[in-house]
Amino acid sequence: MLVDSQNRSTLFYDQRALGAVTDKGYYRVDSPFGNGSTLGITQPQFWNDGNLRWLQLDTNKYGLPGADLLEDNAGSMIRTSRNVGIQSGYLDVFDSAGNLIWSAASASKMPRVVGFFDVPANYDLQNNTFAVNLSFNPWILVNNCPGNLSDDGTVVGYSGIVLKWTGSQLQGRYITKNQRNWSQTLQGRGLRIPIAQFVGI
């Protein structure tokens, strides 16, 4: 069977448990989920390296993932990449140049986006907690999570989406200090953070 398409998914690259953080409690990133005393900076191998990063939080863990601020042993991270080769097999899909971009043999290594942490336009995420009910522990696309931490030695600033997994809800809140607020950034258009499952990993 030959199907023409231009879309190529990323494929599973690796999965690693998030370990201890550094500088725990140094940046008191205050939110409805905690005063920041348990948050620290993740190890460099979990920072943005050009791949897609998918975070799965353990129950009752939280953090500011877009700024690489999480709790100790917060969960796991999967990286997916376009540089992983697709294995030819049943139901191969090719692009217009004849490149293999999907196959049933490799489908289990692709993230299956099954929903979104979908904050609607004009929702006041800075003064309200947004929650999504889920029957599974989601993998959250960190690349779509706004987050920034600044420190010039005198003034500390931060902003972004703080996320918490309760075991049945993914909860989020926009926080800011000495940086732009929600209404100045994304409130007018909203925000969609993909939520995925991985099958066969």
Language-model region placement:
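C-terminal structured domain segments
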Residues: 144-180
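Extracellular receptor-binding modules and their adjoining Ser/Thr/Gly/Asp/Asn-rich linkers
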Residues: 1-44, 70-149, 176-201
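The feature marks the first
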Residues: 41, 45-56
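Short, surface-exposed beta-strand/loop "edge" segments at domain boundaries and coil↔beta transitions
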Residues: 52-54, 60-65, 146-156, 181-183
